[in-house]
Amino acid sequence: MSAPRLIARHYHGHPHDESPRDCVVLDYDARFLRRKVLTCESGERLLVDLSHTTSLDHDGVLLLEGGGEIRVVAAPEPLLEVTADHLPRMAWHIGNRHTPCQIEASRLLIQRDHVIRAMLEQLGAQLREVEEPFTPEGGAYGHGRTHAHEHGHTNHHGQHHDHADHGHSHDHSHDQ
C-alpha cells in the first residue's frame, strides 16, 4: 500500500475553514492518538503525526500540511444511558471511578462496562443500551484525557497559541 498523500501534524478543537476538505469518523478510543494512518470518509488515507498524544474532540480539525482541514466526527458506539431521580449522585459515583461520562440535563452516557453497570443498578439507576456518538467531559482541568495522571497542557481551548507553525493565520480570537 502506498504512503498517505494527506499529512496532518497539528490539531485544533474548532474549525477555521467553513468547508473542510474531508472528515474522519472515529469512536472515543480511536480519537486518542499521536501517530496513526486514518481513512477519511472519502476513502483517502491520512497520516496523523502529532507532537504528543492528543484527545481529538467531535468537530475539531486536523490541519493538513499545505493547507486545509480534516474534520473529526464522533462515531456512534455502544453506550449505556443512565437516568435516575438523583442524577448528580450517579454522576458522582461514575466520576469517582474515573469513568469517562457525557453529562446531559436528563441523562448520563458512559461506555458499556458490566462492573459500572452493576454498581449503577445497585444504586437504583435506570439503564438503557444505546448506540450514539460519545463526547464525554474533558476533566477537571478541561484538557481531555491523558495517559495515567499527567496534568500537563494537552490542547489549546480558550488559550492563546501561535499559528506560525501550521500554515495559517488568524484575525479572530479563540475565546469560546
UniProtKB/Swiss-Prot annotation:
Q: Which UniProt keywords apply?
A: Chaperone, Cytoplasm, Nickel, Nickel insertion
Gene3D superfamilies the record matches: Urease metallochaperone UreE, N-terminal domain (2.60.260.20), UreE, C-terminal domain (3.30.70.790)
Q: What is its main location?
A: cytoplasm
Among SMART domains, the record links this protein to:
UreE_N (SM00988)
Report the subcellular localization: Cytoplasm
The annotated region (Disordered) lies at 134-176
Basic and acidic residues: which segments have biased composition?
Answer: 161-176
Protein purpose: Involved in urease metallocenter assembly. Binds nickel. Probably functions as a nickel donor during metallocenter assembly.
What protein family is recorded?
Belongs to the UreE family.
This chain belongs to the protein called: Urease accessory protein UreE
